[in-house]
């Protein structure tokens, strides 16, 4: 039997190694772990291929009776975080992290918000490679819900759970959003905290995620920090 999962989900070149057909089959395979009528939370980043893979994954899940909660473009931690709070049965994120836009990937989380175990990955691979077909009748097809309000709830929960009081005291922050999934929520979070913030790379176009920016190109944020006024405040890059 072949191998689909690596150390961080299923990844590959979009439309070459990772195709819509495979994404749909992966969605169907999740019926191994979530029963008819149970909830699956899905999020993605800003890659051009993300919408295509999201539609395919959702279709596979719904065709097996699962209800999908589509969070839209959100950072990876938002799916397990919100999913656990809202009692999801399974989570999925479409992203290739720090890779460039031509790559993409799909990773899954269990109901506790943890990465699924290797035994689950092997069951999914067995389902895909053996072309198992267990679609439900039309009257039992799952529903797909678009949830926009949960993004704001995620930011609010982070403020309450993670950000300490007086966090902004004497701090000047430069945030490199890398034209990725945090391009809106990152600035929103620190704006609510009250931090003196400069945000860069906040204009994703589907092709520029991590392009000359982000964790693999620290020169970009270093230049911004150098330009920032740090004489009277501590200056930190994120």
Predicted segment positions?
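Gly/Ser/Thr-enriched, mixed-charge loops and adjacent short helices
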Residues: 13, 104-223
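Short, electropositive, low-hydrophobicity segments enriched in small/polar residues
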Residues: 10-16, 20, 47, 76, ...
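Pocket-edge structural micro-motifs
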Residues: 44, 110, 232
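Positively charged, low-complexity/disordered segments
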Residues: 231-238
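An N-terminal, well-structured beta->alpha segment
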Residues: 1-59, 63-65, 90, 143-173, ...
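N-terminal small/polar loop signature for handling phosphorylated ligands or for N-terminal nucleophile
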Residues: 32, 36-103, 188-229
């Amino acid at each position: 039997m072949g191998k689909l999962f690596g150390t961080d989900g299923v990844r590959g070149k979009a439309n070459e190694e990772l195709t819509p057909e495979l994404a749909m089959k992966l969605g169907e395979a999740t019926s191994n772990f979530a029963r008819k009528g149970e909830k699956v939370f899905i999020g993605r980043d800003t890659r051009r291929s993300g919408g295509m893979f999201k539609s395919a994954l959702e279709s596979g899940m719904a065709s097996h009776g699962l209800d999908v909660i589509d969070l839209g473009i959100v950072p990876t931690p938002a799916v397990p975080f919100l999913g656990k709070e809202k009692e999801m049965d399974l989570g999925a994120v479409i992203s290739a992290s720090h890779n460039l836009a031509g790559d993409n990937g799909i990773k899954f989380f269990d109901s506790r918000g943890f990465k699924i175990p290797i035994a689950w990955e092997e069951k999914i691979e067995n389902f895909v490679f053996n072309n198992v077909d267990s679609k439900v009748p039309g009257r039992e097809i799952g529903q797909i819900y678009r949830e926009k309000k949960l993004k704001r709830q995620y930011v609010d929960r982070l403020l309450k759970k993670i950000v300490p009081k007086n966090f902004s005291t004497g701090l000047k922050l430069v945030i490199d959003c890398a034209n990725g999934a945090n391009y809106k929520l990152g600035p929103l979070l620190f704006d609510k905290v009250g931090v003196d913030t400069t945000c860069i790379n906040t204009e994703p176009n589907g092709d520029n995620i991590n392009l000359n920016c982000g964790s693999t190109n620290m020169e970009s944020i270093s230049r911004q920090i150098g330009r920032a006024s740090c004489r009277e405040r501590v200056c930190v890059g994120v």
